[in-house]
Amino acid sequence: ATLSLPGVGYGIRYEYGLFFQTIEQGAQVEHPDTWLRYGNPWEVPRPELLFLVRFGGRTVHSTDPSGRLRVEWVDTHDVFAMAFDTPVPGYNTGTVNNLRLWSARATRDFSLRYFNEGNYFKAVEQKTESENLSKVLYPDDSTLIGRELRLKQQYFFVSASLQDILPQFLEAQEPFDRFPERVAIQLNDTHPAIAIPELMRLLLDVHGLEWDQAWDITRRTFAYTNHTLMPEALEMWPVDLFERVLPRHLRIIYEINHRFLEQVRRAHPGDDARLARMSIVGEEGGRRIRMANLAIVGSHHVNGVSRLHSDLMRQRVFADFHALRPEAFVNITNGVTPRRWLHHANPGLASLITGQIGPDWVSDLGQLTRLAPQAERPEFRARFLDVKRENKQRLKRLIRERTGVDVNEDSMFDVQVKRIHEYKRQLLNVLHVVTRYNRIREGRLDGMVPRTVIISGKAAPGYWFAKLIIRLIHGVADVVNHDPAVGDMLKLVFIPNYNVSNAEWIIPACDLSEQISTAGTEASGTGNMKL
């Protein structure tokens, strides 16, 4: 919106957020994040925007009077998607874009028959089951039920969004071949990749297009942003789960895969290993739908989010696809907004910068280069350090309030804030704290300055090893922070419930930003950009 580019963001209006994290006896405990308890003054309910989303059922094949094959998706379990709009205004522009989030609504709220029979739970069963779709962000997918809910969530918001987009195009009464000229859909990672077979279904089954025309339109409409280099993090769904939840889409994926593999076979005859790697349907460890492969095959471009990430994506993770379509792979480096992470979160520094170069830097960050001559001026340095000290004093108060630990504001604030994960290596950070603690105990203080190590982040509810790392952090902190021989030379604190609000306190106070993820695993590192 600040660039005056028109756009609409689609997603799910979750009733509860990721989760509210507390620490009890050193362990993470998850609580519902009731972020809507007081309502949301920015959103506008749109009850007139209600779309039917279908699950399950079966497909029925028939031939129409002209001899064309027709497929009907019948006996489905249906849910309504209702829109909530949030305006997103640009900074000092007249552009206001829209964030449209979908909330699940039951097609039938209440069964009077079951209620009159005294079966009160059964009376509201359908309502409860339907509205679970927009209940919680990222349900635990370590169980079959959790995985099924995630797949349903992804299809729910994708189907509603495409049903919202298509009528807007049809109002112009243009031919479908012009759809990609009017609509560009960016797939943010593989979570919405089911949009590819869904658009095919709508074009084939609802609007009666032939396969080749529908596929050409679909492929020219979508582009895919990849966010991870780790093969184990690339989303895959068991075929039997797909068959049960989205039987029509599975058939469409099979046909997409068949035609794509014929193309690969012509380009690389006799290379069965390549065919197996590039297939949308993976056979290893049970048949699975590879959503990243589907996203690549169904998109006109694929981008990484940093130059290194894009290079590794071409050379390693998707090398076979790059060899087939090198022109489709591009780099678009991620970024963060300076309006949020400098102008808003660090008003003291923002005021100092504006006093030196004026306010235009807020929407043109390149102007910060004009600060370079100030770096050698003692007066500017002193004012910069004053701002930093004020930010550290503010964070010190937050740390005391949230953890009970009193830290030294004159120490180096050594910060690692990101989700807790093995590849992000909070474990390495803790081992470094242990090493420094032992050196202090041994009196080896040469070149050492007082340091406060600050860690914050959440572990996925089903990720037991990440939770063990949180327990280790608190175990080490309990020893370090209560050892009088160490005093203010070293402190370790874990700030619970890392979120944007807490980040706005932590980031401006940071002296040292820890970016120690295993080499080659971090796609872009937007957290580093904020710091």
Regions found by a protein language model. Name each.
Residues A1-N528:
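A conserved ligand/cofactor-binding region detector
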